[in-house]
UniProtKB/Swiss-Prot annotation:
Protein name: Phosphoenolpyruvate carboxykinase (ATP)
GO process annotations (BP): gluconeogenesis
Keyword Cytoplasm part of the UniProt annotation: yes
Gene: pckA
Organism annotation: Cereibacter sphaeroides (strain ATCC 17023 / DSM 158 / JCM 6121 / CCUG 31486 / LMG 2827 / NBRC 12203 / NCIMB 8253 / ATH 2.4.1.)
Biological role: Involved in the gluconeogenesis. Catalyzes the conversion of oxaloacetate (OAA) to phosphoenolpyruvate (PEP) through direct phosphoryl transfer between the nucleoside triphosphate and OAA.
Residues given in the record as ATP binding sites: K200, H219, G237, L238, S239, G240, T241, G242, K243, T244, T245, E286, R324, T449
Binding site for Mn(2+): K200, H219, D258
Pfam families with a match to the protein in the record: PEPCK_ATP (PF01293)
Lineage summary: Bacteria, Pseudomonadati, Pseudomonadota, Alphaproteobacteria, Rhodobacterales
Required co-factors: Mn(2+)
Family statement drawn from the similarity comment of this UniProt entry: Belongs to the phosphoenolpyruvate carboxykinase (ATP) family.
UniProt superkingdom: Bacteria
Length: 532
């Protein structure tokens, strides 16, 4: 039995997904919250937020993600980074999932992935959990109600947490699986309730399709100056490095917090919402994000709360350090309605340095920017992936290796071309540790990071004196009014400068060893900018 608004020629039955119980198409937020609460998927929290737990999976499962190895993508997928699945195994998985789904209730959301109408994908999300429908309705872009009558999905995502895959039969690693089939235009997700898999599977899809159209797909946040869409900035970074926090700046308009494209027309958000980390979130440091946690229909994921008062405990990481909330962009007062911006004037690469070696900000040449983009040095922050309980130094190329289906040089060369064509200034910003490594030093003060970023974005930082860093070759400001000058010289923040030198040497060697894999594919200017 079908409920809701849908193109009558594009029901699930018409797609060959038959025999289901109730199917609810394109329910709006109140109906999805009502369904989720009624079905016992979670609780109504303060202000009407939806409080839920994702069970055993509180982060992504990157080792359980696959791409079906079909002729059309055989030569363009980066197979060293993307596990292949045999087409026959996929067909068995798909058939078994559809059989499992029969008689059960499902929720369908027809949504746009991409704010640029010429480049967007029309995506259908089929979810077993009502709150997953609510989550993805926040995260992607919502069509007008009338547009649903003619909506034809380009791609379909089926998420069925109650289905367990069979590794032997389905060609996967465990009973959890996330698999993309570019020939069938189909994504299957099984045996995980972690909502982030929904959005990141669509992101992976766009990261494959858009570069083929000359569009740079980016794991970044973006904003622009108030009233000036041409003064745009993008912030690359892995989960937990500060993309959401640092782009939510009251003095600038937020384009988006996580996934964007850079086309010949400028930047555009892939999404229509935000997925913010909430661990240690405070009303003082991040008032707008904090306020969303008690707004109607915000999805509050894996946060501990008082059973009687429903008060959230922002400091409790007993379920996971990866506590999050998902909300529509219009819950942020200065968010862009269009999701569009001009060509970035500033490109910022965020890193969370657990070694405590890198300065809080450094100016990069275009070649150095390409080097750091391909290197993607950061630290995996606790909770964003299963099993990560403390920061782990890592190199994640393009600041998002788990979501990059193509070889890194494809994205690197696209970015290099965009930076050169539009004259963007590039910066490396360390939101990690200072005064010592993780466990000894302390996190970089967010107040200092914000002050340095503000100066970079308004152009005033370019007017101060810079020094050349002896280890990494980039330029570091010597001082900036309002920022402790010691912070700008990481060596001086360490109690033992010799220990800093030893740590810096170790990090330089790690950079050099990691970058060796890209040397055959890069131009001479980037080779010259290489460290070590």
């Amino acid at each position: 039995m079908n409920f809701g608004r849908v193109n009558p020629a594009q029901t699930l039955d018409a797609q060959g997904i038959t025999g289901l119980g109730e199917v609810h198409y394109n329910l709006i937020e109140p109906a999805l919250v009502e369904a989720a609460v009624t079905r016992g998927e979670g609780r109504l929290g303060r202000g009407g937020a939806f409080l839920c737990s994702t069970g055993a999976f509180t982060g992504r499962s990157p080792k359980d993600k696959f791409v079906v190895r079909t002729p059309s993508v055989e030569d363009t997928i980066w197979w060293e980074n993307n596990a292949p699945m045999d087409p026959a195994a996929f067909d068995r998985l798909h058939a078994d999932m559809l059989e499992h789904m029969k008689g059960r209730t499902y929720f369908v959301q027809d949504l746009f992935a991409g704010a640029d109408p010429e480049l967007r994908l029309d995506v259908r999300m089929v979810t077993e959990l009502a709150w997953h429908g609510l989550f993805i309705r926040h995260m992607l872009r919502r069509p007008e109600r009338a547009e649903l009558d003619s909506f034809v999905p380009d791609w379909t995502v089926i998420n069925c947490p109650s289905f367990k895959a069979d590794p032997e039969r389905h060609g996967c690693r465990t009973d959890t699986v996330i698999v993309l089939n570019f020939e069938r235009k189909l994504i299957l997700i099984a045996n995980t309730e972690y909502a982030g898999e929904n959005k990141k599977s669509v992101f992976t899809l766009l990261n494959y399709i858009l570069p083929g159209k000359g569009v740079m797909a980016m794991h970044c946040s973006a904003n622009h100056a108030l009233g000036d869409t041409d003064d745009a900035a993008v912030f690359f970074g892995l989960s937990g490095t500060g993309k959401t926090t640092l782009s939510a700046d009251p003095s600038r308009t937020l384009i988006g917090d996580d996934e964007h494209g850079w086309s010949d027309r400028g930047t555009f958000n892939f999404e229509g919402g935000c997925y913010a980390k909430t661990i240690n979130l405070s009303a003082e440091a991040e008032p707008e994000i904090y306020a969303t946690t008690s707004k109607f229909a915000t999805v509050v994921e894996n946060m501990v709360y008082d059973e009687e008062t429903l008060e959230l405990d922002f400091n409790d990481d007993s379920l996971t350090a990866n506590t999050r909330c998902a909300y529509p962009l219009d819950y942020i007062s200065n968010a862009s309605e269009s999701g569009l911006g001009g060509h970035p004037k500033n490109v910022i690469m965020l890193t969370c340095d657990a070694f405590g070696v890198l300065p809080p900000i450094a100016r990069l040449t275009p070649a150095q920017a390409m080097y750091h983009f391909l290197s993607g040095f950061t630290s995996k922050v606790a909770g964003t992936e299963r099993g990560v309980t403390e920061p782990q130094p890592t190199f994640s190329t393009c600041f998002g290796a788990p979501f990059m289906p193509r070889r890194p040089e494809v994205y690197g060369k696209l970015l290099q071309e965009k930076i050169a064509k539009h004259g963007a200034t590039c910066w490396l910003v360390n939101t990690g540790w200072t005064g010592g490594a993780y466990g000894t030093g302390k996190r970089m003060p967010i107040k200092a990071t914000r002050a340095l970023l503000t100066a970079a974005l308004d152009g005033s930082l370019s007017g101060v004196q810079f020094r050349r860093d002896p280890n990494f070759g980039f330029e570091v400001p010597v001082d900036l009014h309002g920022v402790d000058a010691k912070l700008l010289d990481p060596r001086s923040t360490w109690a033992d400068p010799a220990a800093y030198d030893q740590q810096a040497k170790k990090l330089v060697e790690m950079f050099a060893n990691n970058f060796a894999q890209y040397v055959p594919f890069i131009d001479a200017d980037v080779k010259a900018a290489a460290i070590g």
